[in-house]
Amino acid sequence: MLKWALVFFVISLIAGFFGFTGVASGAAAIAKILFYIAVALFLLFLVLGVFAVKSIK
């Protein structure tokens, strides 16, 4: 998912460079949403992993 966020970020930079501000803002918004989803999933799995290790001990 972070890969797609990076792809949309690069698309946003390139579109902004060439003057396509609508495309740039749309791609940046998608990249931001995907990044926050990836961070939320990472934190969720981190917490689940900590609880799993504690339950095994």
UniProtKB/Swiss-Prot annotation:
Pfam families: DUF1328. The keyword Ribonucleoprotein does not apply. It comes from the Bacteria. InterPro entries: DUF1328. It is found in: Cell membrane. It is a multi-pass membrane protein. Belongs to the UPF0391 family. This is UPF0391 membrane protein Tbd_2239. It comes from Thiobacillus denitrificans (strain ATCC 25259 / T1). The lineage of its organism: Bacteria, Pseudomonadati, Pseudomonadota, Betaproteobacteria, Nitrosomonadales.
